[in-house]
Amino acid sequence: MASTSMSLTRACKVHAVLACSIPSVSSAFLTTNVTFLGQPVEMPSQRWSQRRCSRPGPVTVRAEEVKEVTQAKGLSRESGGQWLSCTTRHVRIYAGYVDPETQVMDQSQLDKLTLMLDPDNEFEWPEEMVEKVYDKYRELVETYAGADLTEYTLRLIGSDLEHYIRKLLLAGELKYNLDCRVLNFSMGKPRIDPADLDDVEVEE
């Protein structure tokens, strides 16, 4: 298991990025900037989406400029050559920067955490639901501020975020995507209130 001596700090700055790397799959990326070796590092981000966003996005970066920095540097294990990650069914967290267009990881930007949300597109993700998950992610990063940046720490964050997604589903705020390539209802079958159905009598 690879690890680095980097720590999460409370002075982290979060940038949200939406990406549609494959026409049939809509993924969400969230890159978190933290201080590295005591120096704050900022990275402007860009918002991509198949549908028009209602709110203005963050600072725009030209695609060719992003691709120039998104390259593997061949660093050693001591320098982070073995990328840290957390992978669950709907949450993937990487220590590094992932280009939302090419999905290539920049191995030199080890001061960032990148969140990939629901890569299989199992749920429908309206803008407000994406923001809710982002807010929870920011909260979890702040909660674990100061902890060593290890795969164990990333798994704690990823597991908590996975439980939060399940909570949204059970509360009826999040819905399954019925156009998903595979419908296996990984978090339980949909629950329907009979009172919401037409021509159905509900006994008191």
From Swiss-Prot:
Transit peptide, UniProt annotation: 1-27
GO biological process: NADH dehydrogenase complex (plastoquinone) assembly
Known catalytic reactions: a plastoquinone + NADH + (n+1) H(+)(in) = a plastoquinol + NAD(+) + n H(+)(out); a plastoquinone + NADPH + (n+1) H(+)(in) = a plastoquinol + NADP(+) + n H(+)(out)
GO CC annotations, alphabetized: chloroplast thylakoid membrane
Compartments reported by the entry: Plastid, Chloroplast thylakoid membrane
Bilayer topology: Peripheral membrane protein
Keywords: Chloroplast, Membrane, NAD, NADP, Plastid, Plastoquinone, Quinone, Thylakoid, Transit peptide, Translocase, Transport
Top-level taxon of origin: Eukaryota
E.C. numbers: 7.1.1.-
Family: Belongs to the NDH complex subunit M family.
Subunit structure: Part of the chloroplast NDH complex, composed of a mixture of chloroplast and nucleus encoded subunits. Component of the NDH subcomplex A, at least composed of ndhH, ndhI, ndhJ, ndhK, ndhL, ndhM, ndhN and ndhO.
Function in brief: NDH shuttles electrons from NAD(P)H:plastoquinone, via FMN and iron-sulfur (Fe-S) centers, to quinones in the photosynthetic chain and possibly in a chloroplast respiratory chain. The immediate electron acceptor for the enzyme in this species is believed to be plastoquinone. Couples the redox reaction to proton translocation, and thus conserves the redox energy in a proton gradient.
Name of the protein described by the UniProt record: NAD(P)H-quinone oxidoreductase subunit M, chloroplastic
